[in-house]
From Swiss-Prot:
It comes from the Bacteria. Pathway: Carbohydrate degradation; 2-deoxy-D-ribose 1-phosphate degradation; D-glyceraldehyde 3-phosphate and acetaldehyde from 2-deoxy-alpha-D-ribose 1-phosphate: step 1/2. Mn(2+) 1 binds at D10, D344, H345. This is Phosphopentomutase. It is an enzyme of class 5 (isomerase). GO terms for biological process: 2-deoxyribose 1-phosphate catabolic process; 5-phosphoribose 1-diphosphate biosynthetic process; metabolic compound salvage; nucleotide metabolic process. It catalyses: 2-deoxy-alpha-D-ribose 1-phosphate = 2-deoxy-D-ribose 5-phosphate; alpha-D-ribose 1-phosphate = D-ribose 5-phosphate. It comes from Shewanella woodyi (strain ATCC 51908 / MS32). It is found in: Cytoplasm. The keyword Zinc does not apply. Its cofactor is Mn(2+).
Length: 405
């Protein structure tokens, strides 16, 4: 029985990419920065001491990161029995965003430029916002700027509740985000507004519209909920997920995977929010999955809760929790199963600003008869998609080189 389990540690980069200078990200290193802070006692909130990731280390994480940066992350060494194949990958895609990373990993790099709203204030064209408001029957909106998702709730959340005006904001990514209160504005109203925005944004080539639902009564207790929804454009060509589905296989999305691929190539969607629930759902789906199945989970909290918020201790604690549960996955893998762990970009919590960082990502592979040892530097995330295609004997992808022969 052949199955692939993909665990996407959203934003878990392992050192600046070859082209990081073009993005202002030379020196960024999500894993290394977290390990360094832990080793220096600067991440002892909710946890303490050096970063402890014994199971990821067994899969080759520390060695993959060393091959990427040239040095071991503080607290890590080669004093571990590695059971998996490990490497690191550069990105071909032009952006350091979520869709680009995910699509490239599935064999379809984004080689064109996304549209962006680059102005930090008055970010959106009036023509665009006027059309959105007219179609939605709204008399105004708030925001119109680059912002942190939590900071803008503190700043504008009360005014939004008082006026009923949605909050529009963006970031360095190709994204249009809409924040609305679940109760005072209504969740379905938010989703419908996002659908309108998605349609009106087509000429601007924006990658995603994101519904940012929140609850609370004031700045002190406003909190985003698990009812986030991403409205992405479709990948420009067929991903390995599409090819798997077309061949009669199952592709099970856990978390926000289906949204990122605009539901293309997905046969089943499982909703879960938070690291614990996402891991639980992954285990359940792996146990239930039959032959010719892909179970694909995005662990978004690493990015949204800790990377963007520049919370080093929180990121470290989340990594240690994730690591502690990996044996549960190991225990239920079949002899022919392929386990893949990777990331879609970096988001160094020690870095300036709140945006993603252009980094290499880990490529950790276990099972399916793979020999333990180095896979070296991969020239594209697409090597993962090509390897999945090879594993399932699907039609080869246009991009990528398989590490499964």
């Amino acid at each position: 029985m052949k199955r692939t389990i993909i665990m996407m540690l959203d934003s878990f980069g392992v050192g600046a990419a070859t082209d990081a200078e073009s993005f202002g990200d030379v020196g960024s290193d999500t894993f290394g920065s977290i390990a360094k802070a832990c080793a220096e006692g600067r991440a002892d909130i909710g946890r303490e001491g050096p970063l402890k990731l014994p199971n990821l280390s067994k899969l080759g994480l520390a060695l993959a990161a060393k091959e990427s940066t040239g040095t071991f992350a503080p607290g890590f060494s080669d004093d571990v029995e590695v059971i998996g194949a490990y490497g690191h990958a550069d990105e071909l895609s032009t952006g350091k965003d979520t869709p680009s990373g995910h699509w490239e990993m599935a064999g379809v790099p984004v080689l064109y430029e996304w549209g962006y709203f680059s102005d930090l204030t008055n970010s959106f064209p009036k023509e665009l916002t006027d059309k959105i408001l007219a179609r939605a029957g709204l008399d105004g909106y708030l925001g119109n700027c680059h912002a942190s998702g939590t900071a803008i709730l503190e700043e504008l959340g009360e005014e939004h509740m008082r006026t009923g005006k949605p909050i529009f904001y963006t970031s360095a990514d190709s994204v249009f985000q809409i924040a609305c209160h679940e109760e005072s504005f209504g969740l379905e109203n938010l989703y419908n507004l996002c659908i309108i925005a998605r349609e009106e944004l087509e000429p601007y080539n924006i990658g995603r519209v994101i519904a940012r639902a929140f609850v609370g009564t004031g700045p002190s207790d406003f909190a985003r909920t698990g009812n986030r929804r991403d409205y992405a454009v479709e990948p420009p060509s067929k991903t390995v997920l599409d090819k798997m589905k077309a061949a009669g296989g199952e592709v099970i999305s856990v978390g926000k995977i289906a949204d990122i691929y605009a539901n293309c190539g997905i046969t089943q969607k499982v909703k879960a929010t938070g690291l614990e629930a996402l891991f639980d759902a992954t285990l359940e789906q792996v146990k239930a999955a039959g032959d010719k199945s892909i179970v694909f989970t995005n662990f978004v909290d690493f990015d949204s809760h800790y990377g963007h918020r520049r919370d080093i201790a929180g990121y470290a604690k989340a990594l240690e929790y994730f690591d502690s549960r990996l044996p549960e996955i190991f225990e239920i893998l079949g002899e022919d199963d392929l386990l893949l762990l990777t990331a879609d970009h970096g988001c160094d919590p020690s870095w300036k600003g709140t945006d993603h960082t252009r980094e290499r990502v880990p490529v950790l592979a276990y099972g399916a008869g793979l020999k333990a040892g180095s896979l070296g530097r991969r020239n594209s995330f697409a090597d993962i998609g090509q390897s999945i295609a090879s594993y399932f004997k699907l039609e080869p992808m246009e991009y990528g080189e398989s590490f499964i022969k």
